[in-house]
Amino acid sequence: FLSGGTTLKGFGKAAGIPTATWASGGSLNQPGRGPVCATAGVSVSSGQIAGGTPNLANTEQYNGTSWTEVNDLNEGRSAVAGTGKLTSALAAGGDSPPGTNVNSTELWDGTNWTETANLNTARRNSAASGDSTTSSLYFGGYTTTYVANTESWDGSSWTEVSDLNSARGYIGGSGSQTSAIAISGEPSPRNYVETWDGSSWTEVNEINTARAQGGSSSFGSKSFALYFGGEPPASTANTEFWNGSSWTEVNDLSTGRSNLDGSGSAASALAVSGGPPTPQTVLTEEFDAPASLSTVTVS
């Protein structure tokens, strides 16, 4: 609403991110998650995780309190990237068996996983963004070296599009098919950040604490993301918020860890599994920003 004719006031969760804290959530049923599982979900009360080490096919869903086992992936694998919602998700690529890159893609309809068209480039430790089984982006990763490849999914096939400016794996990703962000990754210096506008990647301001193998919110845009945890030199609890132009340090995870997975938005996110660096834990933490009043001056 307008106040005084020139001031716009709004009430929402985005303004509450700087004061939000992480809280303990329900434990996974299956340990051994990460590095990089297929995650999906839009908030702290809506999460999904599939795959994990060693070559797991398990899939679990989160309702804000507890995790429940649902139908497995057709192909067990680790280092897989995924995106979407509890009723419409995608899992692609990965490592199965250890050291063998895969290009297979599976779609989740809310009940079952179905195999579909393969990636053009088999790889692992990539990132993905998107909100359904018909609209996703898959970028970065590792073959026999770190790669910059980016592929776009239209619901039936993958198409090679413009590459990242910096080849990397163990990368954080958030957003949609047309508005995404690629965060950090290996190799050093582990602080690169790029945004995607639907046709090309642009380098933007770096994260404050250089690291890789962290988790990220998955749902949002190139202007709204959360990145947490990671390493080296040791597993960290650092959490940073991206507002579209700069990174801000916010409250840390309760337990520092790397090789963890993330889902949700920058204002309502889940941090799942991970370890310092092993064994992989069953921990879940919830980041839920309080609704707060924000003020913007308009001319």
Segments and roles (model prediction):
Residues 1-299:
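Polar, enzyme-active/binding microenvironments
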